[in-house]
Amino acid sequence: MAVLEAAPEYRGEGRFAAEPALAKRAFGRIYAGWALSQDFYRAGLHLSPETPDLAAYLRVWETRYDTKPAADLLAQLRCWDAGDISDNPLHGGDLPRALAAIRARVLLMPGATDLYFRVADNEAELPHLRDAKLLPIPSIHGHRAGNPAGNATDTAFLREAVRLWLG
């Protein structure tokens, strides 16, 4: 959020006087380091004929958000940041109590290498859920684990896990 809010075009309250092109490029470059895991980069999966080196790969990420309105990106980030199911009068900030109130069966499937939603977070939540299973996606694709676009291995894992879960 900070890179968008630091843009000279930012006017506060989620509004921009104009699209902050440089801030969105920085946003994309920063996100490249968080969207995918260190293992992804070590394995060289970022390399292709179109991106023969890290600099070329990062240039692709720098332009990834060119067509996305900065206000939309900021709103999405703020929703994610505020996403606390216990932050309400019913649960009073008590996350274990809020989790225990969930009656649906829950299949927790974080990416094994996700830098945002870590397996450890779900491990801490699991004991508070009534009927849940933790099944990390064994992927080096970080936050993008399970994204079926161009990832047949993750797709197959997800399909089988959901098939077994639904019985």
Which sequence ranges carry the predicted segments?
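Short beta-strand/loop motif that positions the catalytic acidic residue
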Residues: I102, L108-P110
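Catalytic active-site module of serine/aspartate enzymes centered on a nucleophile-bearing elbow/loop
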Residues: E123-G167
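Short, conserved loop/helix-junction motifs that constitute active-site signature segments
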Residues: L99-R103, P127-R130
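Alpha/beta-hydrolase-fold enzymes
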Residues: M1-T63
